[in-house]
Swiss-Prot record:
GO terms for molecular function: 4 iron, 4 sulfur cluster binding; 4-hydroxy-3-methylbut-2-en-1-yl diphosphate synthase activity (ferredoxin); iron ion binding. It catalyses: (2E)-4-hydroxy-3-methylbut-2-enyl diphosphate + 2 oxidized [2Fe-2S]-[ferredoxin] + H2O = 2-C-methyl-D-erythritol 2,4-cyclic diphosphate + 2 reduced [2Fe-2S]-[ferredoxin] + H(+). Pfam families: GcpE (PF04551). It is an enzyme of class 1 (oxidoreductase). It comes from Gloeothece citriformis (strain PCC 7424) (Cyanothece sp. (strain PCC 7424)). This is 4-hydroxy-3-methylbut-2-en-1-yl diphosphate synthase (ferredoxin). Belongs to the IspG family. Gene3D superfamilies: Dihydropteroate synthase-like (3.20.20.20), Sulfite Reductase Hemoprotein, domain 1 (3.30.413.10). Its EC number is 1.17.7.1. One of its GO terms (biological process) is terpenoid biosynthetic process. [4Fe-4S] cluster binds at C315, C318, C349, E356.
Length: 406
């Protein structure tokens, strides 16, 4: 689904009042046949919720996601048995469908699991707070610098084999920090803060860099949007200071479900994307994973970062509206939603209609009772009876050679 053949090159300095989003320059990191960062389109990903030991169920779930536009699919790997199951999943996926970029999610004391699963996936996600898990001590009041360094060295020794394995195979790692699972020593040193999240990520980045491994993607997720925003912004600031250009994976973890879950995810992900921050996104909903993908693409389209569907412009309706706007918009959407790359405006009256739809490819405007005016761009093409409006709009699109059958 990745649509850009060559990376974009910024042509001007961003302005506060620029209507174009200027994305932060990052290095490209390959995950299978998809590139995260490097000027490529923001990548959409999700995670299956099947047990990885269920080979057929996992293959079917991965395929369902990929077929609707999920470009990278993550699977959970809580044990060695799950890690080995990935070999069968990948083999069956290729045999019955095609290769799909896969990510393994590894958590508690997962070094051996990560080494095994690295053979079968394109990227391994580790959680710095859990990869080398130190059981909290109830009587602890501080971490001395010596203790801090000793655990840091243990982390290095544990992480090194995985880094070298991924480096040898030219695969990727996501250093995925979660606000809710920071290591105890980070909590004691920095508190339950965005600073602790950023320092947790930087510790692992430095280990990777010391081993000359740079195929790294970073995430700093939280269930509270303000914490998530602060963590990513601080991460960008620190990386800029240190000369790092790693791509960022955006997400609000545990966003919930329904309308609020979507709004919460959009508030976090959309805000950062609008600032030029972010190279891949995952909307985490307490729903079927397939429900996450349209939300991702809608966020990207609303910001002008990727255009994968029709952009509908429609007024909210008022006393001047000359037809049932909600009903007509529904009819227009149902007739044209399979198209891509078009802007279609449905406006209720002549007062704001032509001006508000000036950037649209096609316009459907109520000018007098019982009749619809159809526009191509700013040009009025014809006036037709209201009951023929949708059909004639389709005919106009067809006449321009921009129609495809659903």
């Amino acid at each position: 689904m990745q649509t850009l053949d060559t990376p974009l090159t910024p042509t001007s300095t961003p302005s506060l009042f620029d209507t174009t989003i200027h994305r932060r320059k990052t290095r490209g990191v390959k995950v299978g046949d998809i590139t995260i960062g490097g000027g490529y389109p923001v990548v959409v990903q999700s995670m299956i919720n099947e047990d990885t030991l269920d080979i057929d169920g996992s293959v079917a779930a991965i395929r369902r996601l990929h077929e609707i536009g999920c470009e990278i699919v993550r699977v959970t790997v809580p044990s060695m048995a799950h890690a080995k199951a990935l070999a069968e999943i990948k083999e069956k996926l290729i045999k019955t469908y095609k290769a799909v970029p896969l990510v393994a999610d590894v958590h508690h004391n997962g070094m051996k699991i990560a080494l095994e699963v690295a053979k079968h996936v394109d990227k391994v996600r580790i959680n710095p707070g859990l990869y080398v898990f130190e059981k909290p001590r109830a009587d602890r009041t501080e971490y001395t610098p010596t203790e801090f360094e000793e655990i840091g060295e243990k982390i290095r020794e544990t992480l090194k084999p995985l880094v070298l394995t991924l480096k040898e195979q030219d695969k990727a790692m996501r250093i995925g920090v979660n606000h809710g699972s920071l290591a105890e020593r980070m909590l004691f040193t920095y508190g339950d803060t965005p600073e602790g999240m950023v320092e947790s990520a930087l510790e692992f980045i430095r280990i990777c860099e010391s081993l000359e491994f740079y195929n790294i993607v970073i995430s700093l997720k939280a269930s509270r949007v303000p914490v998530m925003l602060a963590a990513y912004r601080l991460m960008v600031k620190r990386m800029d200071e240190l000369g790092m250009d790693y791509p960022l994976h955006l997400g609000v973890t545990e966003a919930g479900d329904g309308e609020y879950g979507r709004i919460k995810s959009t508030a976090g992900i959309g805000t950062l994307l609008a600032e030029g921050i972010g190279d891949t996104i995952r909307v985490s909903l307490t729903e079927a994973p397939e429900k996450e993908i349209p939300v991702c693409y809608s966020i990207l389209q609303a910001l002008g970062l990727r255009k994968t569907m029709v952009e509908y412009v429609a007024c909210p309706s008022c006393g001047r509206t000359l037809f049932n706007l909600e009903e007509v918009l529904h009819k227009v959407r149902e007739a044209t939603k399979h198209l891509t790359g078009l802007d279609i405006a449905v406006m209720g009256c002549i007062v704001n209609g032509p001006g508000e739809m000036a950037d649209a490819d096609y316009g459907y405007v109520g000018k007098q009772a019982g009749y619809i005016s159809l526009y191509r761009g700013r040009e009025e093409i014809k006036k037709v009876p209201e009951d023929q409006g949708v059909e004639e709009l389709i005919n106009l699109i067809k006449a321009d050679g921009r129609w495809v059958d659903p």
